């Protein structure tokens, strides 16, 4: 339920657009050209997502007619621009997901709202130490129906009741004894009434006011007891609004004419966290044309900083500043100076960082962050009075810098101004009750004042509120360490260790690093050795400061294997693949008994170095070290699949580890697939029937594909043996998927092959009428070939069966048209350079090992050419092309199944 001024909706990334609420075009591959109200769940047969264009109303919600109840979200539309719904669709496919995702197997609808964003994905920016805040209300309501306007106090609706009458409905979130409900039509008052309303007793009335069906000119207003307007709505005359344009894919860097557009495109890719396009490519193209460009140098520096490459980032900030100050030593924008200060500070060059931070404060926009950076270095130097002055300047510019509030309290404590510090902490906790830095500072203050019991109480409350969240402890400890407060940082982390000595490894790396910075390398090594003995499970360093910690650990304790492993994880996530592989190799060299380091190396070798031999050796060793890890077994089998290992060999391995296979749906499906590929369809049939499957995103269509394949092949076998009744039974089993598959059939499912073989079966039974009906059904659908990337894309063999069906119906011209289209499509696109669609929100499969899309395209083109020639009766050419498919991909079931038809 979107506000009444929403006339259009966008898909993810604004890649597609539809009119709303009445859709009149194609959306999510479904034809709504008849005019369909897509605001109603019942009218959406396929998985569908849509997001409202900008609205001037402050609400979004949903309403269930049959129980006359709904859910509403209210927030200021100036910051809450995003209004979205997602459904799996009111079809067999969606209803299967209803069973998977809801407690009582009811319809599953996601309502989402976006703060400071209007689409998914659409991220806004957070500047250093910036706070973004908002207020939002979620509320249930009843009786009102499709809300026309809402505030936190009241919801209203008015709609035609026929014969000039208007239904008026009001729901209020609290009890009101006398609210005034006013309904007017121009100068005419249709209703003016004082009513008592509460959440349990909404007000609903039908008013006769000679209204037109579209309620033109009607205005409904609700006044509180004090006469203030609580909510109102004026029905606007219907007007034709232009549909907004869908977004366009970014051009390649070389195709963009202007440096500004290169910068803006790169910035967009960063902001949207684009999965396949790199912002760096656009910035570097710009710098290849103008190496001094301020914006692109600054952007490259920031990108490198976020990847932990501090030294690499420095020259880009310096180049940006050089350009800025060529004519004027006082630039308009202080950001490059601030970023240079941050970069230098992360490298330990505090003197030069101090100068850069100070220069950034010459610009008002960077004073809060710049003065905060200065105050941190002042604290590190022990210059408390100057630091207090700087942090106060920072807070003047950003009163809600919660890190700054903690740092000011620390300065006051260091200067002995305990009362002032405690007052600041109390004031800060009124702003943010969960400012744990201030709470820890309160503990330190109580301890410094000798108030031991109070300190114990503050500590207990802090630990209770922190809930053992080790990453939060690390964040606050890093804040202290960034200001040179290594003793305090270590004391905070001791709160974690005293509760559980066997804790997250990075706690001990942090303690070691703080000791090292404080000049105690003996203690540092002790902590680093301790960190090595902690469980590595779920340890994925992601903070920039953790790069410094792990580098120091590798220096102080060079024999520690895990520090290299953890840093490798960071580098791989930061797409610094060469560094990641080098770290993992060093880790394995020091300790070759940890399976995950070997597994990670296998990923790096295969996906980034294209070294299949080293990848295979590493992954096989990883599995040999831990034969209880079902995940590694799955990945090893997928690698064998990539390397074209024989089906029987792969199946034998899975059967040897049957207990592991049973732990994972993906392994079970792979086992079933192998039985199908080996022609053991009855075994595949039994395995599918014996398990309850749970679908996953990226795995759609996997188990249902094997369910269809084994029944199809068994039916074809029955047809060959003239067991036409058995063939009908098997093919009829594909009409509705059993619930144990966990997945339903898409409303858009193309079933030309099923219908064709049903026609053949009924033809064999002598039922000409049914045979013709199924042959006719088999001719339906698009006859334009296209490569199938996603589970809901049409598979190319469906067109082949359209052609066979036309032939059965005696229309050879249409049959040959289908087959020729397949051949021509393959010839035209065989040498295409294929890329993932710019707007793709997911990959077509849950890929572990990189896929070559150009090889996939060759597979597709050879297949369609082979099928085309098979239909045209040229079996020699058909066999040549389909054999090439099998040569490229021995696991291509469709190709293997049709290769037999070429003999």
Where do the PLM segments sit?
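Single-residue signature of alpha-solenoid repeat helices
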Residues: 279, 313, 353, 387, ...
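Start-of-helix register in tetratricopeptide repeats
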Residues: 260-261, 295, 335, 369, ...
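Long, contiguous interaction/recruitment modules in multidomain scaffold/adaptor proteins
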Residues: 149-257, 436-438, 452, 513, ...
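Residue-level recognition of tetratricopeptide repeat
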Residues: 267-268, 302, 342, 376, ...
